[in-house]
Design a protein with these regions (language model features):
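Bacterial N-terminal signal peptides that target proteins for export
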Residues: 33-44
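N-terminal low-complexity, Pro/Thr-rich disordered segments
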Residues: 29, 57-60
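A residue-level marker of the well-folded mature domains of exported/periplasmic proteins
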Residues: 60-371
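Short, Lys/Arg-enriched N-terminal segments with co-localized hydrophobic residues
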Residues: 6, 12-34
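C-terminal segment of classical bacterial N-terminal signal peptides
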Residues: 50-58
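Intrinsic disorder/low-complexity segments enriched in polar/small residues
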Residues: 4, 36-37, 362
Length: 371
């Protein structure tokens, strides 16, 4: 395993606590230029940075940090939105931030080149699909720093991987889903079958299996086969109709807890749950209640990935000339991933289940429970 650095996200991810686009954009400041959900995510990221005791160093040089987003768009209410919020949270008089959105896979390399040509000090690729183009650019432009969300290092001094052990937090989500289901059936689906997606699904199904083992139950998990490493996928991160079709099919199979791992497509699943009243949803990447409050009534929890804080940190490191190619790995132990609060569902989840989740989290963090 490659050496990884650790960045604590403070206490951003508690378990079981209730709490009452154009293609190019530079430093939007509210109003018509930024969705409310993204502003709220930015506030959450800023709060996490405050926990870390982060302050911006004085600098005469202006640092330009740029994000190359995938086709999900900046307002996907998931990892793109989280990445942009993280960048915004460290923007100030000495740091400017901007992003480019890809309309298709063919835009990845040209968008990265455009950002380099514009003088970006660091280019952050958001999403596994852009990893190859970013690694190639790192070799071609050694004077520019690069970082990739959901990808590993490229073996060059100017390229950093930002990775997350989301199978750990998804294991907790699977255990929670198995304890909550009334029908004995839960489900998950993904956008596309690659590690940044399947890690969530694999952890979720294994969490269900763990619940069955310790409770001597037989909850069924649809959508992912941990042996075959394959399951139910939309095929992209933009087909709302297909995501809706999958969600309805799961309900027909009696699934009453659904975990979509497909970025903004989770909205189709949540909207269906609100309409059908047959299921609840586990959101992915960001806190769904904050990112997509219109779905609050059907979101039992969210599996969090500390994209925003890791993006903010790598920008700060570039600004202070402390950039390192050592990959970052967010885990339960360093709070780089975790579960969101239960919000409206807090009273519906037993104290025993909450305590079990805490014990499981500690065991995973300590290494005594292997996933």
């Amino acid at each position: 395993m490659a050496e990884t650095s650790r960045l604590s996200l403070g206490n951003a991810f508690p378990i079981g606590c209730a709490h009452a686009s154009p293609n190019v954009r530079t430093n939007p400041s509210g109003g018509n230029n930024l969705k409310k959900s993204t502003r709220l995510i930015a506030v959450a990221v800023a709060a996490s940075l405050s926990v870390l005791g982060v302050t911006a160093p004085a600098s005469a040089k202006t640092t330009k940090a740029c994000l190359a987003l995938d086709t999900g768009g900046v307002d996907d209410k998931s990892f793109n939105a989280s990445a942009w919020a993280g960048a915004q949270s460290v923007a100030n008089s000495s740091t400017t931030v901007k992003y480019l959105v890809a309309q298709s896979d063919a835009d990845y390399a040209p968008n990265i080149k455009k950002l380099v040509d514009e003088g970006c000090d660091i280019v952050i690729g958001v999403g596994f699909l852009i990893a190859g183009a970013l690694a190639d650019a790192a070799k071609k432009y050694p004077k520019t720093n690069f970082a990739i969300v959901d990808g590993g290092g490229a073996g060059t001094a100017n390229h950093k991987g930002l990775l997350f052990a989301t199978n750990q937090s998804s294991f907790l989500a699977g255990y929670l889903a198995a304890s909550y289901t009334k029908t004995g059936v839960v489900a998950t689906y993904g956008g596309m079958n690659f590690p940044a997606v399947s890690d969530f699904m694999d952890g979720f199904v294994k969490g269900v299996a763990h619940y069955n083992k310790v409770k001597k139950k037989n909850v069924t998990a649809l959508g992912w086969d941990p042996v075959k490493k394959d399951g139910t996928f939309v095929g992209n991160f933009s087909d709302q109709a297909k995501a809706l079709q999958i969600s309805k099919q799961f309900e027909l199979q009696k699934a009453d807890v659904i975990f979509p791992v497909a970025g903004g497509l989770g909205g189709a699943t949540a909207q269906n749950a609100m309409t059908s009243k047959q299921s609840v949803v586990i959101w992915v990447d960001s806190d769904g209640v904050i990112a997509a409050p219109q779905y609050k009534s059907v979101i039992i929890t969210s599996v969090l990935k500390g994209v925003g804080v890791s993006v903010a940190q790598v920008i700060r490191d570039t600004r202070s000339n402390k950039f390192s190619s050592t990959s970052y790995l967010g885990t339960l132990k360093n709070k780089g991933t975790g579960l969101a609060p239960f919000y409206d569902y807090d009273s519906k989840i037993s104290t025993a289940t909450k305590n079990e989740l805490k014990r499981i989290q500690l065991a995973i963090a300590a290494g005594s429970l292997k996933i």
